[in-house]
Amino acid sequence: MDNYTYSELLKSLQNKCDNIALIIKPEKIKQELERIEKEQEDPNFWQDVLKARDTNKEKVRLNRLLETYQKTKDSLDESVELFELAQNDNDEVTLSLLYEEAPTLEHSVQKVEIEIMLSGENDASNAIITIQPGAGGTESQDWASILYRMYLRWAERRGFKSEILDYQDGEEAGIKGVAFIIKGENAYGYLKNENGVHRLVRISPFDANAKRHTSFASVQISPELDDDIDIEIDEKDVRYDYYRASGAGGQHVNKTESAVRITHFPTGIVVQCQNDRSQHKNKASALKMLKSKLYELELEKQQNSTKNEEKSEIGWGHQIRSYVLAPYQQVKDARSNIAYSNVEAILDGDIDAILEGVLIAKA
């Protein structure tokens, strides 16, 4: 990096920071935080528990956004000042340090951009994830289990928690399907663009001839809805099936019909849950999954109507990402058009760069 390149980077970052300020309006955020604090001082504040909870969530979000923005702006202003001084004094040591810190500064500005993008209605929610293997038997079932582990590792890296709702072992390896919740701040916001088909190309560990195989798996993401969001489901539109649990979480297999499957006839959506010994709890969890999927489907329809889109991104028809392990190693996302070479780390849950790249590409 040289003086000209760094100078252009600073101009670009300053321009981005100015645009961010126009969007978030820091002074208005401060005023809103003052208003919330006064509201919380009211003795009657906690009488409406749901409203109080939502107000607290908003306070945390605004505080975090303001703090992230201010910290980034201060760092950028300091870098601009140091750069001018170092240029005037021909201070090569300081210039070298500034060049080294440039990627960190760039990432800080990007982090604020991401914060703004995660301010949608459900972005702060937990994420319900369903993974289904495509055609191909063991190959696709193994690929589905690799994706499942990838998301679990991503959650672990962020300090998020996960909970299995339904898990079906594959016949030889992998899984026939899994549904689980990732619980953490902005989990849905980060993962919402994972909806679609994920493609794997590799030398098959199940092929004695060591041939290259292509496998597919479908990932669906929906927000875990708060209890105060009312989604009505007509009983005549659903069928409940009860069966014996099996697989992970179903160690009491063949004892009780505690697992629950719900089929929603108007949409064709099928959800199932077997993570608990209680049929009642499994039914409640399955209903929560169904409501989340119906809510997501309705939002998708509205968005497609607004954008006049002909095709949904959810389902088998839309391939969003390719993971190639042979003859070369590369992960490429179709939305951001960015290719990544750290395939092993990605499959171990290091997917923040991919998720953020897609958020920015779709902004």
From Swiss-Prot:
The modification N5-methylglutamine is found at Q251. Keywords: Cytoplasm, Methylation, Protein biosynthesis. Pfam families: PCRF, RF-1. PROSITE patterns: RF_PROK_I (PS00745). Coiled coil: none annotated. Peptide chain release factor 2 directs the termination of translation in response to the peptide chain termination codons UGA and UAA. Belongs to the prokaryotic/mitochondrial release factor family. HAMAP family: Rel_fac_2. This is Peptide chain release factor 2. The gene is prfB.
